């Protein structure tokens, strides 16, 4: 199918002295997306191919964001995204018992710096990032295995990489990976990708500027309590590990932050999917000497 969307938003700074919004300090975002998706007949009927052309314009006016190197300026993001997916999970999308889900996603911008003679090493950040350039690869896979009747094992593997065409510019401050916590991205303005890792506080496994590569594996044992049309409820236990890194040179795929825990999910057609997880993080939170320990996560909506 074909889809088209246009959106805009404004974010204002909060003046703590007057306890009011300061509209002189603002971030304006406008964007548009044109997309096309289709089901493929080859290699089999479970494949889908989605493509989209996306544009975002960020205008900062005396506005501070931790990942940006400037408070005043404009950044433009024109990217082309291709998503090849395969979904054979069934029989129900709420509680799959068999099959798998795969997605390989590539997101690329034009390599603007190849077409001009600018001295990017000495350019200020607001000019260096006026037209964002990067390429981003994501892989996500899930397998569902029926152990016994309503007891299901869900195995999950993920990988993401954000790269740069020009080392003088470096990796974009936008579109980075933030690992840890419940995985719900709310109030984020820099295109970041938030990855859940239960047993750790939100985004705690990523540096201040954001990661450029991440990987994650998880195993979730699910047991259906009730699967009625009015409400589906299942309990789960999980083991998972993941991490993010500031550069591909630092990437150590087996250096994972590990956790385990249990939770419950409730799906009601009127409210969607709701859940709560209790996770224990076995490893230290970066920048501290403390093991993460017990964390509580509230889940709203389907993940991935």
Which ranges hold each PLM region?
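Gram-negative/organellar outer-membrane beta-barrel architecture
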Residues: 1-101, 273-274, 279-304
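Outer-membrane beta-barrel transmembrane domain signature
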Residues: 198, 242-259
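Short Gly/Pro-enriched loop/turn and capping motifs at secondary-structure junctions
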Residues: 226, 242-244, 271, 281-285
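Generic long, charged, amphipathic alpha-helical segments
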Residues: 231-237, 248, 252
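Short glycine-rich, acidic/polar surface loops and turns
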Residues: 222, 259-265
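Short coil turns and loop connectors of transmembrane beta-barrels in diderm outer membranes
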Residues: 8, 42-45, 90, 147-151, ...
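C-terminal outer-membrane beta-barrel translocator/porin domains of Gram-negative envelope proteins
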Residues: 66-225, 237-238, 245-247, 288-289, ...
């Amino acid at each position: 199918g074909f889809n088209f969307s246009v959106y805009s938003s404004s974010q204002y700074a909060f003046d703590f002295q007057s306890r009011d919004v300061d509209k002189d300090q603002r971030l304006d975002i406008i964007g548009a997306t044109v997309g096309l998706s289709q089901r493929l007949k080859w290699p089999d009927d479970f494949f889908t191919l989605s493509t989209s052309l996306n544009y975002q314009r960020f205008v900062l006016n005396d506005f501070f964001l931790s990942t940006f190197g400037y408070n005043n300026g404009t950044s433009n993001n024109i990217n082309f995204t291709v998503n090849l997916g395969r979904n054979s999970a069934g029989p129900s999308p709420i509680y799959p018992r068999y099959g798998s889900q795969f997605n390989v996603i590539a997101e690329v911008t034009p390599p603007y710096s190849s077409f001009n003679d600018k001295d990017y090493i000495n350019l200020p950040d607001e000019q260096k990032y006026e037209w964002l350039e990067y390429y981003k690869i994501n892989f996500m896979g899930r397998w569902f295995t029926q152990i016994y009747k309503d007891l299901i094992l869900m195995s999950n593997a993920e990988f993401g990489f954000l790269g740069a065409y020009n080392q003088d510019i470096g990796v974009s401050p936008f579109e980075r990976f933030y690992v840890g916590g419940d995985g719900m991205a709310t109030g984020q303005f820099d295109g970041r990708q938030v990855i859940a890792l239960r047993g750790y506080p939100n985004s705690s496994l990523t540096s201040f500027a954001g990661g450029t590569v991440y990987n994650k594996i998880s195993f979730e044992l699910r047991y259906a309590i009730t699967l009625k049309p009015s409400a589906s409820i299942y309990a789960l236990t999980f083991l998972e590990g993941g991490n993010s890194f500031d550069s591909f040179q630092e990437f150590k795929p087996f250096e994972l932050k590990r956790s385990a825990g249990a939770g419950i999910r409730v799906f009601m057609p009127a409210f969607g999917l709701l859940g709560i997880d209790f996770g224990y993080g076995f490893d230290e939170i970066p920048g501290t000497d403390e093991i993460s320990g017990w964390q509580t996560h509230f889940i709203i909506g389907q993940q991935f």
